[in-house]
Amino acid sequence: MKDAPEITPVRSAHRFDESALGAYLHSQRAEFSGPLKVQQFEGGQSNPTYHLTIGGKNYVLRKKPPGEILPSAHQVQREHRVMAALAETEVMVPKMYLFCDDPSIIGTDFFVMEMVEGRVTPDVTLPNFTSKERVALYDHFIEMLARLHRVDYQSVGLGEGFGRPGNYFERQISRWSKQYVFSKTEELETMERLMKWLPDNIPSGGETVVVHGDYRIGNTIIHPTEPRIVAILDWELSTLGHPLGDLAYCCMHYYNELENEKALTPLGIPTEKEFLARYCELMESEKIENWTFYIVYNLFRSAAIAQGVYKRGLDGNASSELAMTFGEKCKKYAEKACKMI
C-alpha cells in the first residue's frame, strides 16, 4: 500500500525493557496475550511511537521521550484523555486500550491504542492521489476540524482539568515563549521581536472549543483506498482554546509548501480563501477578522516547536534523525512571521 507508515527497528536512544512491557500488558487485558514484538514508527518528532504485535494482532504504543524534556511538553496522558473522550463523537480517533503512569515499566508514561490501517503522508500535495481524490480528501479534512470544533467539551468530560476557557492566546504565547527560551541555542532577533509583538496584538473575543493543536494532513490516517480520513493522531497539544488558532495552524501549508496558489487548482487543492470559506460554511460562521494575527502566532509557535525538536536532536533524545534540520526551520518560520507584522 502506497503511503504506508514506515516501521523500523527500535532506535538505540528509544529502547526499553520489552519483557517488562510484555508482562505488564498481559496482566492488564486478556487480549494482550501471546508473544510481543516491538518496532518503531519513523517520525513522531515529539513522542516516540511504537508498533506492537501481540499474539499476531497489531497495536500502537506512544510514550514520552527519554532524557530531560521541556516543561509541560510530551503530554501523553493528555493525548490518551482527549482521544478517549472523543470516542463517542463524530471525530475520528483510534480506540484507546490503556494508559500507564508507572515509570518502573518502561521508564516513562505511555498508552496503547488501536492500530488503524490506512495511508499516512506528510506531503500536503498528496502526490499519490488524483485531482478528484484531493478535492474530496481536503473537503473531509476541513470537515473533521469543524466536527472537532462543534464538540460540546463539557458533555464529553473535558470541562475539568483539560484547559481553561478564555485568555487562550495570552497563555499560549507565554507558554511557547518560555519553551523557546528553555531550548534556544543561539540568539534570534526575530523571535525576540515576535515575543514582544504578539501579546500586544491579540484580537478580542472568541469562543472556546476543543482544539487539536497540530491538525495537518500528516497527522491523519487516510482510508486505504478511499479519499477520506479514518483517524486523527498526535493530540498532545490539544486543549480548550480558540478555534481560529487551530484553523490557522492547519493553513500553515499555504505559507510553506503551497505558497504558489496558482498551482493549487489543477491539483484539486483548495486555495486558502476557499479553505476558509468552506470552514466558515461548516461552522455557520461569518467572515474571519484579524487573520494575519492568527497566522503570525502560528508561525511563531511553529518556530518554538522546531527549536525544541532541534535541541532534542543536539541532546540525542529526538524521535527522528530529521531533528537536526529543525534549527533552520525555526529561523525560517520566525523570519516569515516578522515580514507580516
Regions found by a protein language model. Give the residues of each.
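Active-site activation/catalytic loop segments of kinase-like enzymes and analogous catalytic loops
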Residues: G245-E284, Y297-D315
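All-alpha amphipathic helical-bundle segments outside canonical DNA-binding/catalytic cores
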Residues: G163-R164, E286-Y297
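Hydrophobic residue at the +6 position relative to the catalytic HRD Asp in the kinase catalytic loop
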Residues: T220-I222
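Juxta-kinase regulatory segment immediately upstream of eukaryotic protein kinase catalytic domains
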Residues: M1-F32
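Activation of the activation-loop gatekeeper triad in protein kinase-fold domains
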Residues: L233-S238
